[in-house]
A protein has these predicted regions:
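Gly/Pro/Ser/Thr-rich low-complexity, intrinsically disordered segments predominantly at protein N-termini
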Residues: 1-176
């Protein structure tokens, strides 16, 4: 009887991954100074590390979320499973109910209710449009975008809002 074909994905160097756990365990990937995500084909996609302003805004946004929302969990660098691979969310907020359903998975099978992307100069509008759509498809209620100047945009599936529905007093500018 012939052997079954290999089911794991291979990159150009022949390295293989089948799950996000495989990506996390890969010793070569752990040493790279890049943000790592996967695409819909299971291939690893690397981005340059974020710049200093991004690194300053990320914890500020996380603290502000904790200040403006209670009864949930704020996460940073959260791997979220989407229809087009695992995406690394900059900041997110899970309700206690949603968090309880996730368990101890190495990636979240559902998006947090609030997903925040902090833009870097390397991000394109098309890339952010796609991520926004993927987060909504994965269960996000709101997607927030923080521009390179710190301007906040609050989006729901049906369009942009002037404020967040869950955190209406959240500032529309994140200064650093």
């Amino acid at each position: 009887m012939p052997e079954a074909p290999e089911t794991k994905r291979r990159d150009a160097s022949g390295r293989r991954w089948d799950t996000w756990d495989d990506v996390q365990r890969d010793p070569l990937l752990r040493e790279l100074p890049f943000k790592i995500e996967t695409n819909q084909h299971g291939q690893v996609v690397m981005s340059p590390p974020p710049g200093f302003p991004h690194s300053l805004r990320q914890p500020r946004i996380a603290r502000l979320l904790e200040d403006h929302l209670s009864g949930g969990y704020v996460v940073t660098e959260c791997p979220v499973k989407t229809a087009k691979g695992t995406k690394g969310l900059d900041v997110g907020w899970f309700s206690s109910e949603r968090r309880a359903k996730i368990g101890d998975s190495s990636q979240s099978p559902v998006a947090p209710e609030i997903c925040v992307e902090i833009l870097s100069p390397s991000n394109t509008e098309a890339e952010m449009d796609e991520k926004r759509a993927l987060y909504f498809e994965a269960g996000a209620e709101e997607v927030w975008l923080c521009s390179t100047e710190g301007d906040m945009r609050f989006l729901e599936a049906d369009g942009e809002q002037t404020t967040s529905q869950r955190a209406p007093d959240f500032p529309d500018q994140i200064d650093v």
